Swiss-Prot record:
GO BP annotation list: viral process
Function: Increases viral DNA accumulation. Enhances infectivity and symptom expression.
Record-given protein name: Replication enhancer protein
Keywords: Host-virus interaction
Record InterPro entries: Gemini_AL3
Superkingdom, taxonomy of origin: Viruses
Protein family (similarity comment): Belongs to the geminiviridae replication enhancer protein family.
Subunit (UniProt): Homooligomer. Interacts with the replication-associated protein (REP). Interacts with host proliferating cell nuclear antigen (PCNA). Interacts with host retinoblastoma-related protein 1 (RBR1), and may thereby deregulate the host cell cycle. Oligomerization and interaction with PCNA are necessary for optimal replication enhancement.
Coiled-coil ranges (or none): none
Organism: Tomato pseudo-curly top virus
């Protein structure tokens, strides 16, 4: 859904993409927040942002995808999870060959499916996508 207008994204808007090799550093990853709970579990918030060149090709004004991860492992830090997450998402996008909104979401789901649910659990995924209106 477009967070500015409230309209649902169309199929063509979600499937529009560009080749992975055409854009240098198409997406970048940020560690938003790491919170340690009293039980030893960690809540880690990761953010994926589209680069300016990718946003221009896809016709986006803003594209932020946020993933909240609940880690049961006391050894898994936010930086370690961010490195693994970045590696696997970029590897999956490289294997697909095309970057689109749907392919990025598929890559995130692929990463979540790769790891055992006992290590971490992703309870929420939210986004901020705004299409260019002009």
């Amino acid at each position: 859904m477009d967070s500015r207008t409230g309209e649902l994204l169309t199929y063509t808007q979600c499937q529009t993409g560009c080749y992975f090799d055409d854009i240098k550093n198409p997406i970048y990853f940020r560690l938003q927040n790491t919170t340690t709970m009293a039980t030893g579990n960690k809540i880690i918030t990761l953010q994926i942002r589209a680069n300016h060149n990718l946003r221009k090709v896809l016709g986006l004004q803003i594209c932020w995808l946020n993933l909240v991860v609940l880690s049961v492992s006391p050894r898994l830090s936010g930086e370690a999870l961010l490195d693994r997450f970045k590696f696997h998402v970029m590897k999956h996008l490289n294997n697909l060959g095309v970057i689109s909104i749907n392919n990025v979401i598929r890559s995130i789901n692929h990463f979540i499916d790769l790891f055992d649910q006992r290590v971490f659990y992703a309870p929420s995924f939210y986004y901020n996508i705004k299409m260019r209106l002009y």
